[in-house]
Amino acid sequence: RMARILIIRFSALGDVAMTIPVIHSLAVQYPQHEITVLSRAVWQPLFQGLPANVGFVGADLTGKHKGLWGLNSLYSELKAMHFDYIADFHHVLRSKYLCLRFRLANKPVASICKGRAGKKKLVRRHDKVMENQKSSFRRYADVLEKLGLPVLLNFSSIYGEGKGNFAEIEPVTGPKEDQKWIGIAPFAKHAGKIYPLELQEQVIAHFAANPKVKVFLFGGGKSEQDVFDAWIAKYPSVVSMIGKLNIRTELNLMSHLDVMLSMDSANMHLASLVNIPVVSIWGATHPYAGFMGWKQLPVNTVQLDLSCRPCSVYGQKPCWRGDYACLRDIKPEQVIAKIEGLVD
């Protein structure tokens, strides 16, 4: 029997990207069901490559769906779609309210268990418990299992076994030929996750000097653009992608990279959706918290063993030592070696 499944995850970009391997697996394993994703409208392009039984509803949380009135009108829109199951992958005030309304209407609802206690033990300053926590992918899949929809996570790429259509990006990137393409996404939301820019510049300088390699910089916003402009002036072979691509074409380009260097950031998760290796740098945060990119190998992480790490699940806490040694003490040579191990 065909069932209609609603999956809720509003933000942030990295977490929304992490729903894709789970939703893709669900769609393929339950082709008879209709799946609808409720998220912020801006993330819709992420879901375009999914199987035909996946639809999307964009929430306008700063406009018509703002506040209690807005949520009630959003609920009315959803109610009219006659869902049989509601899977809350977010479990924040907004999604809890929608789920309450669905529960009152007698619909089966399941919500994510965030595993806060285990994460807390991981980041506390004293008596840390260094245990690998369940990944977000597993937590999302657990929500579906509670609804009687167990899923085997066997996703490889939004492009299946291939890559994005190169003709779509070639006008921006030029031909690839036998060059090695390296993507670098040097930023993250918080200082505790950003490898110091002067050290990242040494990594860029190293690869920019090699004519067989092309470096693409990924980022967004004015301050990041200023940093990129300064780097490009020094290293003319390096290309900034700011303002040149949308989410869809950015994923396409990522699929043609040989390796991506990123922080613990959304770009790590986007690159992981197109089946390329990611070298990820970890400071205040740690892969043990469960936010490692899909199918990324621990051997491709760069991180230091410090007794204070990790100090934060999301990286927003300022460094209590004051020196961000967890990032500052990573040598550019370590990062270069990891990247070269993957492109050679």
Feature-to-residue mapping (PLM):
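Catalytic machinery of carbohydrate-active enzymes
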Residues: 1-344
